[in-house]
């Protein structure tokens, strides 16, 4: 009898202990199959590793440390952005960015590189929130690319250019570079918004970027062709050659769906062509920054007389590129909001 009373009393205490306690929450599901997300989020030949939509923001930040099909894209550019911050700290110890007017383009290219890398990392991390945020974050990504394009053009024009090429293009180079950077952003945003399939969509996105790259890299290519100095006397040339090779490799993987098309269903986490594109683009950026830094240090006797008088305010053009690209992305985001609102009616 006493034993039965004790057991009932123990059961009562246990029940009281659990009163008011929340039941244990199940672990969130971080990835789902492609069939469980809208077609907007689908990647060719990638059938799993997608993140569910309409979770809270904390969920998507937590996926930074989870396995999903955007994780490598996030980390490649996030780590590179952190490396650039360390590089900038190192440069600040030896370069007087405040007092040396010729150091400003060097600061701009580091800032522009950090901008595109960080915007890209944020876009790939948070774009799965919803259809609206998918569009908006990739529009932000395209703004970063436009800023980087103009920053690259400025650095090449200021430090890498040969006097003979400078004489030919000085009046039009930077304004044209700013226009093409904006056009690249606008074309990419419009292609994303319109979702045009096939060749036409690729033309909207890739043709302006290709034109911008041809102009932006022209001082480097001209110098590689005409430079009489051997590589050991001009070490920046090796880095410039590397950045060209890395960019072309990056462009090849961006424009195709290799290698996932060779192994359908096997590249959910690793091995996607866009991941390889990210890696080569990071290598291109790092090689470019080393080349530009070496040019800043070693070619002052060449670039200082060339830029004694400026036909254009490059700081103003830089800000114009940032502002026009940002406004374009904002406008397209509002068009997306309207389109999605009409779809839900």
From Swiss-Prot:
Tissue note: Detected in most adult tissues. Higher expression found in white fat and liver than brown fat and skeletal muscle.
UniProt KW Transmembrane helix keyword: yes
Segments on the Extracellular face: 96-102, 158-168, 265-268, 337-345
Membrane protein topology class: Multi-pass membrane protein
GO molecular function list: steroid binding
Cytoplasmic topological domain: 1-74, 124-136, 190-243, 290-315
Membrane-spanning intervals of the chain: 75-95, 103-123, 137-157, 169-189, 244-264, 269-289, 316-336
UniProt KW keywords: Cell membrane, Developmental protein, Differentiation, Lipid-binding, Membrane, Oogenesis, Receptor, Steroid-binding, Transmembrane, Transmembrane helix
Gene Ontology biological-process annotations: oogenesis
Keyword Transferase set for record: no
Source organism, top-level taxon: Eukaryota
GO CC annotations, alphabetized: plasma membrane
Subcellular location per the Swiss-Prot or TrEMBL entry: Cell membrane
Induction per the UniProt record: Up-regulated in PPAR gamma 1-induced adipogenic liver.
Misc: Non-classical progesterone receptors involved in extranuclear signaling are classified in 2 groups: the class II progestin and adipoQ receptor (PAQR) family (also called mPRs) (PAQR5, PAQR6, PAQR7, PAQR8 and PAQR9) and the b5-like heme/steroid-binding protein family (also called MAPRs) (PGRMC1, PGRMC2, NENF and CYB5D2).
Sequence similarity: Belongs to the ADIPOR family.
Role of this protein: Plasma membrane progesterone (P4) receptor coupled to G proteins. Seems to act through a G(i) mediated pathway. May be involved in oocyte maturation. Involved in neurosteroid inhibition of apoptosis. Also binds dehydroepiandrosterone (DHEA), pregnanolone, pregnenolone and allopregnanolone.
Name the UniProt record assigns to this protein: Membrane progestin receptor alpha
Species of provenance: Mus musculus (Mouse)
Taxonomic lineage of the native organism: Eukaryota, Metazoa, Chordata, Craniata, Vertebrata
């Amino acid at each position: 009898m006493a034993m039965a009373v004790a057991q009932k009393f123990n059961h009562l205490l246990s029940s009281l202990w659990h009163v008011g306690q929340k039941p244990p929450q199940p672990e969130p599901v971080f990835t789902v199959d492609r069939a469980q997300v809208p077609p907007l989020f689908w990647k060719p030949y990638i059938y799993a590793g997608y993140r569910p939509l309409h979770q809270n923001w904390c969920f998507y930040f937590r996926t930074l440390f989870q396995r999903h099909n955007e994780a490598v894209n996030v980390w490649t550019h996030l780590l590179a952005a952190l490396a650039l911050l360390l590089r900038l700290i190192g440069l600040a110890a030896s370069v007087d960015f405040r007092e040396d007017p010729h150091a400003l383009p060097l600061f701009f290219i580091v800032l522009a590189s950090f901008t595109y890398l960080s915007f890209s990392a944020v876009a790939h991390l948070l774009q799965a929130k919803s259809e609206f945020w998918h569009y908006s974050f990739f529009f932000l990504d395209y703004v970063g690319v436009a800023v980087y394009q103009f920053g690259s053009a400025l650095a090449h024009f200021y430090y890498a250019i040969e006097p003979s090429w400078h004489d030919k293009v000085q009046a039009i180079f930077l304004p044209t570079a700013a226009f093409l950077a904006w056009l690249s952003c606008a074309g990419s945003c419009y292609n994303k918004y319109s979702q045009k399939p096939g060749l036409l969509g690729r033309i909207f996105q890739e043709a302006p970027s290709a034109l911008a790259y041809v102009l932006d890299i022209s001082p480097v290519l001209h110098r590689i062709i005409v430079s009489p100095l051997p590589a050991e006397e001009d070490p920046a040339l090796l880095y410039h050659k590397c950045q060209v090779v890395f960019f072309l490799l990056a462009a090849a993987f961006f424009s195709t769906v290799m290698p996932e098309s060779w192994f359908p269903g096997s590249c959910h986490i690793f091995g996607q062509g866009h991941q390889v594109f990210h890696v080569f683009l990071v290598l291109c950026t790092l090689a470019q920054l080393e080349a530009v830094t070496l040019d800043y240090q070693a070619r002052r006797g060449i670039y200082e007389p060339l830029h004694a008088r400026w036909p254009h305010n490059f700081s103003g053009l830089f800000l114009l590129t940032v502002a026009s690209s940002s406004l374009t992305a904002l406008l397209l985001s509002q068009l997306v909001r309207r389109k999605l609102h009409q779809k839900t009616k």
